[in-house]
């Protein structure tokens, strides 16, 4: 994304929907002059060096007339973008916001491109590239887990270790190159043994970082919950109660559900995808329903393999729903490693008052009819979500996708540098690999970048950010 970095840019920075407050944002070296030409800044105010706020009247011409605006001004480079910046706060009406933006453009600003404010912050050194991507992660976060990850990345928890690793690698490279400069002198700036150890430590750090990025990049913030069990175990009714919908067909006839039924829900700030599956059963080949049942079982098995939580439903009035599984491990045999199993005894309302499901080895007893135990099941699901979020140390998905190749290259160059050192192939080759590793790490944090990289990162932003 090539940009005239000295231009004063302007954009609407709030949603174009009715709201008590809307924002028009400006940034650029002529920002103060633009505000003066808009007549929302006095000459005396324009000469100040400290950030300030002032209530003004902005004339928008006929038929809109004049409106009251609050003007927030950062008159020096000590702003988000590293340039003089300002915001006009006014009533969040789309026509008023657009007319205010038009007034700024008539006064000498130009319309900002997507992500241009954050790109200027990056170019000014206020943010590195991973932090800039985290801004978009905060904007796009759909639940608390992804928001926490984006905020962590914005705080520098991803870039700081990488910048430290790059700095350490530069120091090591300086020692190696100093040794080359004084090759005829009896001076050892760093021994091969120490160099190998330090390079291997850096390689391990990058491997760990790449693994975290891989985990986050391939994972969805939405937790997949699959409802399983024998036919007529109450799965569909439980799905409807949990989602407060009538998405699944409920009848007393076993085997009603054949296709997967998927519903989105949210509890405790976390997003969940609930999946109702066909009951686990086997049919004789002579049974005309066998092909349909087999296909339904394949769909259920596929859903189970990708699920984070398996809710195994046992009909409390039947009693053998869990025994038929032989052991809890059988349920998770083909599930992903981090999956959790919750055994739920359904139809609690049809059992005696003092019955709690322990005889069936159930974790919970619920009644979709009365709602008993449903809140406890939701609490278990939210608890799982919080534990998963606490254990994640990854990045926003955009960063994970962008950085994989660069980190892989850095790891490969460090491995090659270690190999050249072990084989005494010459410090010229070692230094060359180390320089390539430094460059690859710089591509992650943005110390090394091209216009194509900036296009890819900031082109995903909306205008005004």
Curated annotation (Swiss-Prot):
- According to its UniProt record, the EC number is 3.6.-.-
Q: Which cofactor does it need?
A: K(+)
Listed binding positions for GTP are 232-237, 251-257, 276-279
- Start and end of every TrmE-type G domain? 222-386
Q: Any idea where this protein resides?
A: Cytoplasm
Co-factor binding details: Binds 1 potassium ion per subunit.
Record's GO cellular component terms: cytoplasm; cytosol
Record InterPro entries: G_TrmE, GTP-bd, GTP-bd_TrmE_N, GTPase_MnmE, MnmE_dom2, MnmE_helical, P-loop_NTPase, Small_GTP-bd
Q: Which domain of life is it from?
A: Bacteria
Write out the entry's keywords from A to Z. Answer: Cytoplasm, GTP-binding, Hydrolase, Magnesium, Metal-binding, Nucleotide-binding, Potassium, tRNA processing
Which EC main class describes this enzyme?
hydrolase
One MF term from GO for this chain? GTPase activity
Specify which residues bind Mg(2+) according to the UniProt entry for this protein. Answer: 236, 257
Q: Where does (6S)-5-formyl-5,6,7,8-tetrahydrofolate bind?
A: 25, 87, 126, 465
GO biological process entries: tRNA methylation; tRNA wobble uridine modification
Functional description taken from the UniProt entry = Exhibits a very high intrinsic GTPase hydrolysis rate. Involved in the addition of a carboxymethylaminomethyl (cmnm) group at the wobble position (U34) of certain tRNAs, forming tRNA-cmnm(5)s(2)U34.
What's this protein's family per the entry?
A: Belongs to the TRAFAC class TrmE-Era-EngA-EngB-Septin-like GTPase superfamily. TrmE GTPase family.
Q: Which NCBIfam families match?
A: small_GTP
HAMAP family per record: GTPase_MnmE (MF_00379)
The record describes its quaternary structure and partners as:
Homodimer. Heterotetramer of two MnmE and two MnmG subunits.
Q: What is this protein called?
A: tRNA modification GTPase MnmE
* Organism of origin: Rhodopirellula baltica (strain DSM 10527 / NCIMB 13988 / SH1)
The organism that produces this protein has a lineage beginning with: Bacteria, Pseudomonadati, Planctomycetota, Planctomycetia, Pirellulales
């Amino acid at each position: 994304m090539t940009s005239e970095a000295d231009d004063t840019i302007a954009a609407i920075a709030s949603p174009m929907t009715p709201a008590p407050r809307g924002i028009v944002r400006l940034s650029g070296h002529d920002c103060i002059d633009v505000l003066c030409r808009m007549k929302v800044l006095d000459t005396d105010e324009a000469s100040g060096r400290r950030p300030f706020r002032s209530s003004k009247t902005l004339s928008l011409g006929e038929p809109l007339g004049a409106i009251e605006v609050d003007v927030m001004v950062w008159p020096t480079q000590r702003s988000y973008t590293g340039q003089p910046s300002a915001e006009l706060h006014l009533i969040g009406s789309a026509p008023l916001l657009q007319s205010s933006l038009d007034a700024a453009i008539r006064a000498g600003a130009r319309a900002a491109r997507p992500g241009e404010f954050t790109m200027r912050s990056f170019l000014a050194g206020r943010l590195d590239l991973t932090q800039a991507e985290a801004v978009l992660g905060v904007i796009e976060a759909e639940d608390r887990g992804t928001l926490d990850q984006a905020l962590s990345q914005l705080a520098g928890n991803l870039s700081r270790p990488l910048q430290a690793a790059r700095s350490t690698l530069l120091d090591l490279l300086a020692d190696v190159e100093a040794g080359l400069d004084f090759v005829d002198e009896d001076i050892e700036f760093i021994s091969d043994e120490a160099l190998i150890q330090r390079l291997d430590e850096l390689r391990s750090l990058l491997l760990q970082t790449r693994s975290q990025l891989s985990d986050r990049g391939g994972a969805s913030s939405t937790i997949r919950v699959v409802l399983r069990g024998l036919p007529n175990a109450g799965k569909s009714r439980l799905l409807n109660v949990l989602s407060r919908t009538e998405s699944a067909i409920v009848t007393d006839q076993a085997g009603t559900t054949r296709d997967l039924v998927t519903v989105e829900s949210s509890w405790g700030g976390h997003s969940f995808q609930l999946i109702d599956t066909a009951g686990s059963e086997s049919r004789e080949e002579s049974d005309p329903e066998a092909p349909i049942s087999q296909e339904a079982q394949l769909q259920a098995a596929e859903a189970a393999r990708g699920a984070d939580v398996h809710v195994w439903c046992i009909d409390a009035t039947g009693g053998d729903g869990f025994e038929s599984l032989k052991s809890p491990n059988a349920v998770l045999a083909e599930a992903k490693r981090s999956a959790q199993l919750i055994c739920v005894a359904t139809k609690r309302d049809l059992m005696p008052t003092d019955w709690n499901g322990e005889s069936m080895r159930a974790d919970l007893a619920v009644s979709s009819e009365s709602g008993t135990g449903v809140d406890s099941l939701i609490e278990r699901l939210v608890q799982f979500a919080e534990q998963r979020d606490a254990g994640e140390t990854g990045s926003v998905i955009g960063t994970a996708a962008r950085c994989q190749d660069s980190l892989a290259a850095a790891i490969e160059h460090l491995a090659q540098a270690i190999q050249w050192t072990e084989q005494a192939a010459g410090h010229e080759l070692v230094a060359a690999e180390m320089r390539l590793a430094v460059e690859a790490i710089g591509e992650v944090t943005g110390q090394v970048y091209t216009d194509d990289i900036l296009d890819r990162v900031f082109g995903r932003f909306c205008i005004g950010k």
